């Protein structure tokens, strides 16, 4: 690290001159595995037992997956902050791996850094996820003899909308990886790190609803709510825990994920999606405990199993985290407040290891000065009973950024034992309303987050007249060879059609994707007569005389039967994307005679599969009596391969049995009229 020239008062991050991402750390080579385990276990576990645990790393080549994940995370935060004009460095310091926390702090101090903002890789407030990090920063400062550096900490970020969105989208993507299953036979199990009951009792900010369990339940409810909002439904969900450690006699949060998975078949569950909302990245606990052990338990229980991704470096999550960092800096300058309900610095007494634990020095807290701790911290180590490994449930079996590797004294409380441990954590929405009566791979309207898009009011769209025409042509005679002449021909024809009052959503180059068609023009209007006028004008234009019609159809938006808030993307404020695929379809006669509940169930499954691909935008319009089809559908996306993926995935749903016709397809790239003409045959 070179001398820091960025500690300028004009930097958006002033008064901070560095951001320090603090993570758990892990071995970066096979040679580091045993030293890492000795460090994590504090010498309390025999060497032969550590050797057994070390074998967990063999399947990863002796390298913890946390390292790559954290490195990418640090880079993502740095890049996002630079977009906001931040020039101060974003660095990494690990508690148990290189680069070590003390080394990072010492290096920063040597280069003149005196005020640091720390971001820990834990979204939730508890001793192991918050206070322990603050204590270890203070201890590292004391060990290094640094007494003139202030380290503040970003508050827990589980409330961040981007964190919720990242987990919701990961969950919807995961639905695509399980076989088609009735909603009532599908279960979502949200998973987080288990902690001792005594740590749960002392977690949070001391206010009702801020404890560890309540934080997770709130996130589960918000993630489930977003999934339900996207396509109108959400399977029943539970909250379970992984990575329990310590003495078997000490109570920890339950149910354990393995035990819970084994209980699901007797509840009629056939498919399960495990969503690790308690973790920010794919580290050892996620990959080993869920991808291997939980997956094996599910297989043994006859369950179809998949695991959703962690939030990782999802763009919305990183953007919100950068916003929290900038907000903290503004608050430190006296220019604003925090963007979350969590106090910064932490309130006195929050997130102790257990309710009566004696505080030791910690940075960024109301009960201890937010400066380097005194020299007496050097020998301070949390006390407690000797660590007793419990089979494969040892804390060092699953090291990760939120691992609880320190033993916990017995809780002074008597935790309530429940006959149904999931009763406090299960969604009440076991009966889910179905989505709309069409083939749209997206559901209820949500305000757009892409800057290209604009919000609309669904009720106004449903109350208005919204029409579209899709007209396909082939080049019958060569276009002019001279560039200016060809450009005038095309631009004049487009302008002449536009004088009808129509809006042109796009020109699409079909060449090569079909042998008999070269152009599709997508027009939209509030009046079908305007669409007809535009078509007549285009056919009579100079360009029109070079073209022959291949296919043309009209559709109109009608409020959906099962989900009135579903809107076609073309009328929902969604900007056109680079690629589009257009096709008609006709349902079978049997479809319309099915009970509404059956159609709703099948469309609900269809919606779960399709809505997981939120990057592909769908516009389904009714075409009854307007031509030979019942529906006209357009799929738009920035990546043509993603449109292919969506169409393939939708072949596996039950509603597909009730489709008689779903061709022809017209697929092409959206281009300007001039670009399209430049690509065509010339005289």
Swiss-Prot record:
Q: Which cofactor does it need?
A: Fe-coproporphyrin III
User: Region annotation Coproheme decarboxylase: residue ranges?
Assistant: 460-683
Q: Which Gene3D superfamilies match?
A: 3.40.50.1400, Apc35880, domain 1
Keywords recorded for this protein, A-Z: Heme, Heme biosynthesis, Iron, Lyase, Metal-binding, Oxidoreductase, Porphyrin biosynthesis
GO MF term set: ferrochelatase activity; heme binding; metal ion binding; oxidoreductase activity
**What reaction is this protein's catalytic activity?**
Fe-coproporphyrin III + 2 H(+) = coproporphyrin III + Fe(2+); Fe-coproporphyrin III + 2 H2O2 + 2 H(+) = heme b + 2 CO2 + 4 H2O; Fe-coproporphyrin III + H2O2 + H(+) = harderoheme III + CO2 + 2 H2O; harderoheme III + H2O2 + H(+) = heme b + CO2 + 2 H2O
Note how many cofactor molecules are bound and how: Fe-coproporphyrin III acts both as a substrate and a redox cofactor.
Instruction: List the pathway annotation.
Output: Porphyrin-containing compound metabolism; protoheme biosynthesis
- The EC number(s) given in the record are 4.99.1.9, 1.3.98.5
Q: Which GO terms describe its cellular component?
A: cytoplasm
Q: Which InterPro entries match?
A: ChdC/CLD, Dimeric_a/b-barrel, Ferrochelatase, Ferrochelatase_C, Ferrochelatase_N
Region Coproporphyrin III ferrochelatase: start-end pairs = 1-330
Q: Where is this region: Disordered?
A: 382-456
Residue positions of the active site: 583 (for coproheme decarboxylase activity)
The residues the record assigns to binding Fe cation are 193, 285
Which terms under GO biological process does the entry name?
A: heme biosynthetic process
> What Pfam families does the entry give?
Chlor_dismutase, Ferrochelatase
- Protein's job: Involved in coproporphyrin-dependent heme b biosynthesis. Catalyzes the insertion of ferrous iron into coproporphyrin III to form coproheme III. Also catalyzes the decarboxylation of coproheme III to heme b (protoheme IX), the last step of the pathway.
The protein's matches in HAMAP family, at most eight in alphabetical order, are given as: Ferrochelatase
The entry assigns this protein to a family as follows:
In the N-terminal section; belongs to the ferrochelatase family.
Q: What is this protein called?
A: Coproporphyrin-dependent heme b biosynthesis bifunctional protein
